[in-house]
Amino acid sequence: MAGFRFGFVDALVHTLFPPSLPARASIVSGAVLGADSYWVGDHLNALVPRSVATPKYLGVAAKVVPKIDANYEPWTMLGNLAAGNRLNGLRLGVCVTDAGRRNPAVTAQAAATLHLLTRGKAMLGIGVGEREGNEPYGVEWTKPVARFQEALATIRALWDSNGELVSRESQFFPLHNALFDLPPYRGKWPEIWVAAHGPRMLQATGRYADAWIPIVLVRPTDYSCALEVVRTAASDAGRDPMSITPAAVRGIITGRTRDDVDEALDSVLVRMIALGVPGEAWARHGVEHPMGADFAGVQDIIPQTIDEETVVSYAAKVPAALMKEVLFSGTPEEVIDQVAEWRDHGLKYLVVINGSLVNSSLRKTVSALLPHARVLRGLKKL
């Protein structure tokens, strides 16, 4: 397996700029800094409550992003980006697409198409999705994990069919003389990166995935324990457990000084990230999750229904110690040390969210750019 690598992910939110310009700028800067991949999210609307996506909390950025819930469709955008990406050479992927509202045959087709367009540089990130992108639109949400397991098995069945008719019983996605005849690129399909956290998801990762990319694990010890479950499942399925890339999606907040970092961590929008962490993580810090002790986390939030007063009250309850778990934060040297600890617990690939961009002060947002670049360069040396 290669040494430590990193990519980065952007939300595909509509801005005042031409639709693909922010993404293209990110790809160019990422290539300069040594990134391996560029990812885009897959959401119908934002995970940030629109009630606080305002100048009061976002500053000037709210003028650039006037509607936080206006999100572009990811596969369409990636197809557009692929045309100009050959010189940069970054791999392109969705982080992560939804096994609920997207039929797996359509997902298999989209990923295979992008793989051909990019000459073998497409990646399929996939997970259960979130309630906010399913239930409000009439998509059944009572068994998201079972639906995900069947979606993943369906994608593999279609890709492995060699153009032969496929029939397969399934509670959610039965196939009856189904046909999938797109070819792989030079004999290889896109890598499947699974956002898994619970036991059944981790087992499915070991059975079907090329990489594991959790989003809400908050401690390196949790990471290493879950990675062991993935590798055991891979062995049980007759696969090489070490062939599965251990990755993670994590936000990074850095700045020129520790005071700048602490100020950013204390903002309402950044503290809202902790709402996506399950109640058990809050309980370790002696605080009940404001949405309930048993709240599952990001997959069950419907942010468009949360008003400003409620958001602010929730943010005030977030323990400072929890904020330091849900993000890599600090000076560049401190952040690199934190990533190194995760590396020592098995992490080999980090997909970065630049949390330093979420700041009501334009000056401090700009001043964090160079420290963030120092972090990314430092990751290459891990």
Swiss-Prot record:
One of its GO terms (biological process) is lipid metabolic process. It is an enzyme of class 1 (oxidoreductase). SUPFAM superfamilies: Bacterial luciferase-like. It holds the Pfam family Bac_luciferase. InterPro entries: F420-G6PD/mer, Luciferase-like_dom, Luciferase-like_sf. Catalyzes the reduction of the keto moiety of phthiodiolone dimycocerosates (DIM B) and glycosylated phenolphthiodiolone dimycocerosates to form the intermediate compounds phthiotriol and glycosylated phenolphthiotriol dimycocerosates during phthiocerol dimycocerosates (DIM A) and glycosylated phenolphthiocerol dimycocerosates (PGL) biosynthesis. Belongs to the mer family. Phthiodiolone/phenolphthiodiolone dimycocerosates ketoreductase subfamily. This is Phthiodiolone/phenolphthiodiolone dimycocerosates ketoreductase. The lineage of its organism: Bacteria, Bacillati, Actinomycetota, Actinomycetes, Mycobacteriales.
